[in-house]
Amino acid sequence: MNAARPSTATAENAFAADLFAGLPKRYDLLAEILSFGQNGRWRWRLVTHIAADEPKKILDVATGTAGVAIALARRTGGSVTGVDLTESMLARGRERVSAAGLDDRINLQTGRAEELPFSNASFDAVSFTYLLRYVNDPAATIAELARVLRPGGVLASLDFFVPTNPAWRAAWWFYTRAVLPAAGMAFGGTEWWRVGRFLGPNISSFYRAWPLTRIVAAWEAAGIVDVRVSPMSVGGGVVMWGRKAHA
């Protein structure tokens, strides 16, 4: 298979696009607030695992306002293609790319992770952030991400997680159920209140259905080897990375 089939949006895609459509203007500031200041540190770890290989051609999926894409371009000197469902997020991302002086090395386009419009082995590295909770079939999505990665290339991801320590898990539960919605309303209005109210239950339900062992198995089934998992900030986030096996 040299390219994905024509894109067909799912209910999960439509929900994600609607949830984030009103957020771009203050997304980056509020993402830091709602992650208790950890989003930038998590992102740095993700980028580090890709930049170590000095890839020349990188795909960043669920790129949002292009924060990861910009960091990758700066750290690697390579070209970055960013893909996201939400055009308003991409519009804000293009503003940020231009402000960073990186228009010649970063291209942002609308697209779906489940059906990427790229040929097999098109990229030296692939990153994705906060993605799998918004797709219908995480395993198939991981396989599609691996399809466009060249053999030997790095696949890396970042997402929220649920702490395993009981005390930290209780604190996380209170933070995601009470603090996040209130902080979202206080700093970002109704749109961010919706996101704050949604995130905690969504994260919990996703990892009940898709524990890390199952996610790692999906990476391996897609041909990714040497998969590593690094919980961040006492388990509030998780970074994963691995390499596509050579044929």
Model-derived features: where do they sit?
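A short SAM/SAH-binding and catalytic strip from SAM-dependent methyltransferases
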Residues: 124-138
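Core SAM-dependent methyltransferase catalytic element
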Residues: 222-247
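A short glycine-rich, Lys/Arg-flanked "PGG" loop and its adjoining helix->strand segment in the class I
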Residues: 139-151
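A short acidic, Gly/Pro-enriched loop at the edge of an enzyme's catalytic core
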Residues: 114-125
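Conserved alpha-helix/loop element of class I SAM-dependent methyltransferases that forms part
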Residues: 35-56
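Conserved beta-strand signature within the Rossmann-like core of class I S-adenosyl-L-methionine
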Residues: 153-160
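Class I SAM-dependent methyltransferase SAM/SAH-binding core
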Residues: 57-115
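C-terminal alpha-helical "lid/dimerization" subdomain adjacent to the S-adenosyl-L-methionine
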Residues: 162-218, 228
